[in-house]
Amino acid sequence: MATSLSVSRFMSSSATVISVAKPLLSPTVSFTAPLSFTRSLAPNLSLKFRNRRTNSASATTRSFATTPVTASISVGDKLPDSTLSYLDPSTGDVKTVTVSSLTAGKKTILFAVPGAFTPTCSQKHVPGFVSKAGELRSKGIDVIACISVNDAFVMEAWRKDLGINDEVMLLSDGNGEFTGKLGVELDLRDKPVGLGVRSRRYAILADDGVVKVLNLEEGGAFTNSSAEDMLKAL
């Protein structure tokens, strides 16, 4: 059961009274601590020991709230080169494209999703860029590409399922090479769905391969990497 321990220092006394109380039928036990003990404590110190399950949840919340979302890449950096793949829809052949050739001399939006056919990616993230592709291009964007740690065959099947034509390129980072160079790996090996190591969700605006905007999500969250967010940044 939970136990509450409260320590308070009385300004008019040379000792501190410590009360230990259990929430059920156990009586309250009080004793007076020696002055040497109280001097080692900061004034108005309060310690509380709660049920471990509650503590764990609150600690997790604090961690998400205070831990900065970081990556190896940052605004002002040149995008690392890497080879991505896709299926040519007219021939079914596997084609490759390098990040450098995709971005050289162009304004490019690269956005990543944790996985093809996953709910948020299929229902919100990719369709948002498809629907806003015209607006983005009217503001000077030359290339819009979605990257995922899936193989090229899965990405092509996903493209067909979403009914995408040439609005957005769906590119495979099958081995996670580009994802690793950016430092945005998402380790999902402890999850039961078998996703393994994927990419965190992000959206990057690059001008001639140099990062101008980097909207990086915590894991697979979807809060600041949408097409609307990129339109606001232009």
Swiss-Prot record:
Subcellular location: Plastid, Chloroplast stroma
InterPro entries, A to Z: PRX5-like, Redoxin, Thioredoxin-like_sf, Thioredoxin_domain
CDD domains named in the record: PRX5_like
Tissue specificity remark: Expressed in all tissues but predominantly in buds, siliques and seeds.
PROSITE patterns, per database record: THIOREDOXIN_2
Keyword entries, A-Z: Antioxidant, Chloroplast, Oxidoreductase, Peroxidase, Phosphoprotein, Plastid, Redox-active center, Transit peptide
Active site annotation, chain numbering: C121
In-chain residues carrying the UniProt-annotated modification Phosphoserine: S82
UniProt record, GO biological process: cellular response to oxidative stress
Pfam families, per database record: Redoxin
Catalytically driven reaction(s): [glutaredoxin]-dithiol + a hydroperoxide = [glutaredoxin]-disulfide + an alcohol + H2O
GO cellular component: chloroplast; chloroplast envelope; chloroplast stroma; cytosol; plastid; thylakoid
Transit peptide location: 1-70
Transmembrane portions of the chain: none
Molecular function terms from GO: thioredoxin peroxidase activity
Domain (Thioredoxin): residue spans on this chain: 73-234
Misc remark: The active site is a conserved redox-active cysteine residue, the peroxidatic cysteine (C(P)), which makes the nucleophilic attack on the peroxide substrate. The peroxide oxidizes the C(P)-SH to cysteine sulfenic acid (C(P)-SOH), which then reacts with another cysteine residue, the resolving cysteine (C(R)), to form a disulfide bridge. The disulfide is subsequently reduced by an appropriate electron donor to complete the catalytic cycle. In this 1-Cys peroxiredoxin, no C(R) is present and C(P) instead forms a disulfide with a cysteine from another protein or with a small thiol molecule.
PANTHER family: PEROXIREDOXIN, PEROXIREDOXIN-5, MITOCHONDRIAL
Homology family: Belongs to the peroxiredoxin family. Prx5 subfamily.
Function of the molecule: Thiol-specific peroxidase that catalyzes the reduction of hydrogen peroxide and organic hydroperoxides to water and alcohols, respectively. Plays a role in cell protection against oxidative stress by detoxifying peroxides. May be involved in chloroplast redox homeostasis.
Protein name: Peroxiredoxin-2E, chloroplastic
Species of provenance: Arabidopsis thaliana (Mouse-ear cress)
Gene: PRXIIE
